[in-house]
Amino acid sequence: MIEACDFLGGQEVGETVAIIGGGLTGSEIAYELALTGKKPIIVEMKDDLISQTGVCLANSSYLREWFALKKIPVYLETSLKEVKDGSIVCADKSGKEVCIECDSVISCAGYVPAPLTEKRTNTYFVGDCKKVGNLRSVIWGAYEAAMKI
């Protein structure tokens, strides 16, 4: 299993790729993989894809509809139990296990902010080291920090 950051940094994956986490990152990676001819499979614990706040409704709706149109397998209310060689084992909300064959697994299950330094005078945290967000929240945070300087 590799992290989303590793994939985005260029790490190769197989033909059929299980994506653990159907938030914005996982959904965008699935979209990119499908556009390049790979076969993504999304596994999401929540009852919907891209359920976090602050995401443009047009973007999230487009991705949901595109996955349905392209018949991208999406397992909602499903959690990862085990990663095996050539497959993953998941459980749905009733506890029923399902084995999903795949060549690679990408973890997109979320991140925790991790500043590289402590808060000091004239130090402003922006971006994911303050709070994991999206491009809009990063730009707004940087603007607000710049206005304080």
Q: Model regions: which residues?
A:
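N-terminal glycine-rich dinucleotide-binding loop that anchors FAD/FMN and/or NAD(P) in oxidoreductases
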Residues: 4, 55-81, 147-149
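Rossmann-like dinucleotide/flavin-binding elements
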Residues: 3-54, 92-104, 108-149
